[in-house]
């Protein structure tokens, strides 16, 4: 009976995997077959011209890179520091449990809420305006809970014997963290960072309120400039009635970039 149950469970697992792969393959084929025809060197490297009917999406690609790099550059050091404190220095107690629960809850907050928060705080209160800086900080705050959670799990997965051996050899607590804990936890930390890079790069709602504009004549010249970004660009094109094949081409390029990041 146990062998039959194991076989049925394995069969269900295989069917679920095949089901997911089928829809993934269908999605990739649909986007590729409809969008590959408009992908060209001009499309990827030139600025838009003639009311967005000519040229390319280079400013949107560059803008998305600026926002993603800025967000991760803000979230990674802060998130890693928070994870180290919560795992290695904070005393066990009610307050720490509340903080951890709050971090886990923040990871499930809709992105539009982060966008409204960024608009109210960074755009209005701090006076950064609709800019790369406001968008990067908003996206960084959105990525922060995920990076903290992934870093905590990776640090807690380090065997206690590694730490005890380091301390027994005369290393300080901080030396043990820097030389033993972090190198061992690095794969798990990087996995969390990569997943959050994919999330940040594809979000539209936060930058809709804080950073994005539909059209610029060139590339941004400072962190206080408005910026074109691929996610918002797709949203704008879908609502402006432009040619569907161009929209699909941009979607293909974003999908290919996202797959490359995850690999």
Locations of regions flagged by a protein language model:
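Periplasmic/extracellular loop-to-transmembrane helix junction in inner-membrane transport proteins
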Residues: 1-12, 30-71, 92, 236-248
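Transmembrane alpha-helices
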Residues: 72, 150-151, 173-211
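Interhelical loop and adjacent transmembrane-helix boundary motif
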Residues: 51, 55, 207-258
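Short coil/turn motifs that cap or connect alpha-helices
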Residues: 161, 172-173
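Transmembrane-helix boundary motif in ABC transporter permease subunits
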Residues: 71-103
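Glycine/proline-centered hinge or cleavage motifs at structural transition points of membrane proteins
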Residues: 110, 169-170, 183
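Hydrophobic alpha-helical transmembrane segments of multipass integral membrane proteins
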Residues: 62, 66-74, 78, 82, ...
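Generic hydrophobic transmembrane alpha-helix motif, especially the helices
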Residues: 104-140
